[in-house]
């Protein structure tokens, strides 16, 4: 369990940086329930920050949010797929009040197995007795019963896997069509009323259930392309704490994940619940610095977790529109999670030229599936790309 928050005045720093539009739709939106989400919305609005992807009800969470500038109007349609069912907003009806929360893009997965492995798992299900449990629970709860080609493996009520028969083994992911269409309709509306439409999705998910895979899962790729078809100027993925590749679709960029702007774990003033301390084997009266310093290094002093791999280099995207034509350039940033001074770890600085060159090569490799090529321009100090 990972529950965390910061004090409302932390948002003053975003306001001081003139960050105007912020998506608050993510897997922590309702860590402290619907009231926590409502408190966040009100704290942002009090500071002139426009909260995107969240609302006092589902209709508000799904709506585009706008910023008018001297150069034109920008719209943001924001949503989240990661654990979205835990935090989705709800509209009122005759019986219940509206519930604050996020704009969800819910999704599901099935584990597809060839005949031999499918039958093996079905036999194991019978040996465990969970097949009989599922049949009885399904009858009482009026669920669809198992079929010859699909069944749920595990506990009927406390977690199970959807198993399907197929020609090969793979993870089949699929999107909630109603959620997707509602988001696309918001994008169509925004495109009619703005000069630039940014569709953004908070998504940790990767291929084959791996949050740290190079590529996004199929449902994210398909959704991103549909946002462009609906009128988005670009699609921005965020959530995974490292950069994923870029696809150019119908002339518009899909940034599958920018990475992180900040990862100020050790020096940050996070507020952490007792349950989260327990998850990391600490007492409930521990300090945030206890938790985060333990996550930074192993007992033998070697770097661990976010400090041990590819999480330092991330990037910003500069969007420039001239004569109704949009151009994009990538500006790599270095969070340097291994700085000697732990107070500086996770704070962004512009990457040096050599790191920018290396990052252009990394993005080209991470975008191989899409055929996008990146090149570092020393005169501009940024990375350009074509698809």
Located regions from the model:
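Acidic, metal/ion-coordinating pockets
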Residues: 1-387
């Amino acid at each position: 369990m990972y529950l965390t928050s910061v004090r409302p005045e932390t948002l003053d720093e975003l306001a001081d940086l003139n960050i105007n539009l912020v998506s608050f739709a993510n897997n922590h939106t309702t860590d402290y329930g619907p009231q926590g989400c409502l408190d966040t919305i009100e704290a942002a609005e009090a500071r002139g920050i426009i909260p995107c992807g969240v609302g006092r009800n589902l209709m508000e969470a799904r709506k585009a949010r706008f910023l008018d500038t001297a150069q034109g109007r920008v719209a943001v349609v924001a949503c989240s797929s990661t654990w979205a069912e835990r935090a989705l907003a709800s509209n009122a009806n005759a019986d219940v009040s509206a519930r604050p929360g996020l704009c969800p893009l819910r999704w599901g997965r099935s584990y597809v197995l060839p005949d031999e492995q499918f039958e093996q798992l079905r036999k194991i299900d019978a040996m465990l007795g969970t097949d009989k449990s599922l049949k009885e629970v399904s009858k009482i709860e009026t669920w669809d019963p198992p079929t010859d080609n699909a069944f749920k493996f595990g506990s009927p009520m406390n977690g199970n896997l959807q198993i399907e028969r197929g020609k090969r083994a793979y993870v089949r992911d699929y999107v909630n069509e109603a959620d997707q269409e509602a988001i696309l309709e918001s994008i169509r509306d925004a495109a009619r009323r703005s000069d630039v439409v940014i569709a953004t999705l908070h998504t940790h998910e990767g291929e084959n259930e791996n949050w740290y895979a190079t590529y996004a899962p199929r449902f994210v790729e398909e959704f991103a392309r549909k946002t462009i078809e609906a009128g988005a100027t670009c699609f921005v993925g965020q959530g995974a704490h490292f950069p994923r590749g870029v696809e150019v679709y119908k002339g518009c960029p899909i940034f599958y994940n920018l990475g992180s702007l900040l990862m100020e774990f050790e020096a940050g003033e996070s507020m952490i619940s007792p349950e989260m301390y327990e998850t990391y084997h600490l007492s409930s009266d521990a300090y945030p610095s206890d938790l985060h310093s333990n996550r930074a290094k192993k007992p033998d002093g070697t770097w661990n977790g976010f400090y041990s791999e590819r999480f330092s280099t991330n990037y910003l995207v500069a969007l420039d529109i001239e004569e109704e034509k949009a151009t994009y350039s990538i500006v790599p940033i270095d969070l340097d999670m291994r700085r000697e001074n732990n107070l500086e770890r996770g704070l962004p600085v512009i990457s040096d030229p050599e790191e920018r060159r290396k990052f252009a090569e990394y993005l080209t490799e991470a975008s191989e599936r899409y055929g996008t090529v990146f090149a570092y321009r020393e005169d501009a100090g940024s990375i350009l790309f074509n698809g």
